[in-house]
Amino acid sequence: MATLEQKLTVLISDTIESMGYELVGVECQHAGRFLTVRLYIDKEGGVTIDDCSDVSRQVSAIFDVEDPISDKYNLEVSSPGLDRPLFTLAHYARFVGREMVIHLRIPMFDRRKWQGKLTKVDGDLISLEIENNGEHQFIFSNIQKANLIPVFDF
C-alpha cells in the first residue's frame, strides 16, 4: 500500500515538472490537529520565494479538485536548503562524497542515527564512512530520513 507521500508525489510531480522544477520530495508530518504537507522543489540556479508561491498555488488547485487529504492540512513549499533531504537512490548517487546524517527505521548496532561520508551507492545499499568506525552499509528501505550536512567554506 502506498504512503500518503507516495500518493501525493504521483499526483503532483508532472505538474511541478511541467513548471520547470524538480520535485525533490514530499514530507507529511502531524502537528497537533493539523497535517503539514511539505514539498521540496529545486531548479537550476536555485529557488526563489516567488517560485515557491507559484508551485503552492498550482498544487493547492490540484488538492482542491482531487481532495487527496482527508485531514486539515497546511501546505508548505520550499527549497531543499543547505541540509538537503535525500528521498531517492538517485539523490544518494548524486551526492557521493558528501557528509550526511541518516535516521534508520530499525536500529543497527543499537543506533538509529548515523553520520558519515557517503562513499557509494550499490543497488539498494548505501555506504557511509563513519569517523573512527569504518565503512557501514545501510539498506535504502531502512532509511527513514537522510540529510546532507552543510559545508561552509570561509
From Swiss-Prot:
Transmembrane segments: none
A biological-process GO annotation: translation
Keyword Cytoplasm attached: yes
GO cellular component, one term: cytosol
Secretion signal span: none
Localization annotation: Cytoplasm
Keywords (A to Z) from UniProt: Cytoplasm, Ribosome biogenesis
Primary localization class, coarse: cytoplasm
Keyword Transmembrane annotated: no
HAMAP family named among the record's database cross-references: RimP
Free-text function comment from the UniProt entry: Required for maturation of 30S ribosomal subunits.
Cross-referenced PANTHER family: RIBOSOME MATURATION FACTOR RIMP
Similarity field: Belongs to the RimP family.
Protein name: Ribosome maturation factor RimP
Organism classification: Bacteria, Pseudomonadati, Pseudomonadota, Gammaproteobacteria, Pasteurellales
Gene name per UniProt: rimP
